[in-house]
Structures are given as C-alpha cells and as structure tokens.
Amino acid sequence: LYPLIDADVLLYEIGFCGEYKDEDGEHKIREWEFVRELLDQKILDICEAVFNSQPPTLYLSATPKLVKQWNRLHSDNLEWKPNFRIELATKKGYKAQRKQEKPFHYNNIAAYLLATYDCKLAIGIEADDAMAIDQTESTIICSRDKDLKQVEGWHYSWPCGKQLAFGPTLVDKLGSISMSKGKIVGTGLKFFYSQIMTGDPVDNIPGLPKYGPVKTYNLLFDCNSEKELYDVVETCYKVVYGELWEKELREQANLVWMVRDMNGEEPIMYEFPNG
C-alpha cells in the first residue's frame, strides 16, 4: 500500500513533543535535532504499520508562509487562497473557535517536511480533502482525524496518548456507526450523514438543532442504503426548517463532506441520491 500521511497532525503532535515543563514548572524547548529524529521515526513507524510498498506522500494544508516556501523550493508560482468552507459557513464561522497556540518547532517541522519528503500542499481545501481526492484501491490514508473515515478505502490511525490505533482497516462505501462515550464514531456514508445531523463541535459546525448523537444514532443505525440515510436526514431537516430545509441541509453537508474531486480549482460537492 502507498501511504498518504496527514502531516497537519504531525505538525502539532511532534511539535508539542519538542517542549516540556521541567521540575520547577519552567517551559523548556528541546533541540531541533531531537524533534527531527522523532519526526522521521514517526513517519517510518507509520509506513511500517501499513506495510508500505513505496515511500509516502505527506499532505499539508496551505498557509501563506508554506506557499512561499514551496515556491522557493520548487521554483513554482502557487497562490494561496483560504479554505472554501470559510465562505460556505453562514451560521457559525468555520473553525472560528480554534485558538490553539502553535508549538515552538511548528514552522521548523513544516519547512523540513517540504524540503525532505514528497509533499502536497492543499490550497483552497484542507489536507484531508487532498488525501480523499488521492485515495485509490492501492493507497492508505494515515491520519488521526476522525473526519477522513467517511472516505472509502484503506485507513490507518496511529496511537497517541489515550487514542488507540485504528487499522489498517478497509472502509466500504456505506460504512457503519456506533456509540462511544456519548459520541458517534464510524466510517463511510453512515458517518457522513450522522455528521450532517450532529454537526462537528471541533470544527464549529452546528448541524441540526436538537439532534444530538443518541437521537441521530437511533435514526440512522438501521439504514441499509445511501437512499435510506438521505430520506431520514431530509425528513428531519424538513421538520426543523420547513421550506428552508434544502438550503440548510446543503450547507451542513458541504461543510462536513470530504472532497473527492475538483473542477479546476473548485471542489465538487456531494451529490445526494435524488440529485
């Protein structure tokens, strides 16, 4: 299998391993060489866990700084543009609540990855979307991001802290959902449709009012086709929004959908079963 690695996750995971508090509670920064070795080893561990048959490609969500670095390295002329979801979100700002401080070595890690590994910059979309676009029968998405599990194909999540490893596992198109600690976890279209209902607090996506995880799970668990999933979700949106149901449903679906294809520079949105 050919690993597609979510480097957005590594920027933070490895970055925060590069700092600590000593016995006096003072914030300390580890040497870059320590962080670099940790990063290289993590990438190697991921590749070995999925029995890779060729070197990985690492995916990064573009920032203006990363685009400049890319252009210098590749004598390219890419132009940065923001994530398309920012413009789509009308109820809440997409990821507007995220105020996480970047680790000290964040930029060092990004620059090192671009200079050392085969990387792809996701411009106007997220690294997650770029990985979903490139997923084939011979690739495996390697990420700890739950959203990517809606994508059909091979998946692997490496362990980190209390988060256990997932896979390598083959996800089918319909997928499945289950309840874990009061939340819906799952794969494929079932997980995608559940997100349309519940939203995603991590990304500041509101979902459908008054449809939490338990209620949504009970409605979608027994669905055996894409059409059944859609019919349930459409009915619920009509109950809440009346004549505005289609607009509201489309917005939430476009926000949680992992893009699978592009039309030039524009992402192609999900097509519901009824068109």
Tell what function each PLM region has.
Residues 8-9, 14, 82, 92, ...:
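Flexible, active-site-adjacent loop/turn segments at secondary-structure boundaries
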Residues 1-81:
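Non-catalytic, usually N-terminal nucleic-acid engagement modules in DNA/RNA processing proteins
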Residues 21-25, 77-80, 96, 159-162, ...:
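Short, low-complexity, polar/charged sequence segments that are solvent-exposed and flexible
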Residues 64-107:
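A charged helix-plus-loop insertion that forms the helical arch/lid used to bind
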